[in-house]
Amino acid sequence: MLQLIGKGTTQKQQIEGGQKVKKAGIELSIYFMPGAGGKQYTEKNAIDTANVINAVNPDFVRLRTFVVKSDSLMYDIVKSGEFTECSDIEKLLEIKIMLEHIQNCNGYLASDHIINLLQNVNGYLDKDKNAMLDYINTFLALPRKTQRKYQIARRMGFAGDWTMLDKLSMHYQYIIEQYEKNVSDGKQFEKLLNQYMDNYI
């Protein structure tokens, strides 16, 4: 995975470096990019990241959802067919897999960027892990129509969760309803979401 995205380090080097930082008493954050491996490496990306977290026990794990920005080198790679981007939901599933594989860690998981689909996935990995997984599973169990409405709202900058969609203005509720109804093709729907996310990266 690290070689695929040109990180310039190995998993072993990241673990050794992280352990040295922790031993020195310096606050450490590990960033997880769900979707960075594309569809081909989605599970590997999640499990490999969990293994590093387990070995290092960082103070923070910060979520930074991977998005392919238009007119970027990665965008050209996607168009060439060499890389297949994960859907919004698949990236969320990656976060779930990562969480499920984290053990004996007490750092804080922070969904602290607007690019993340669920901003309320926050908590301590020892005390709040099950609650975070329950929150993700609750969203995944929603009717697809509700998920899609929330995805559109979130990508338009909505800071609440799906239980608060009725707090949006009638204008935005109408726009979201029209998008949800008229953009039925899955690829076109993901393209719509990415157009909004382009504004944040």
Region spans (language model):
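An N-terminal domain-start capping segment
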Residues: 16-27, 116-120, 126
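Conserved non-cysteine loop/helix-boundary elements of the Radical SAM core domain that shape
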Residues: 1-25, 35-56, 74-86, 90
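Non-cysteine beta-strand/loop elements that form the S-adenosyl-L-methionine
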Residues: 1, 26, 58-69
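A cross-domain feature marking catalytic cores of carbohydrate-active enzymes
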Residues: 30-34, 63-65, 111-113
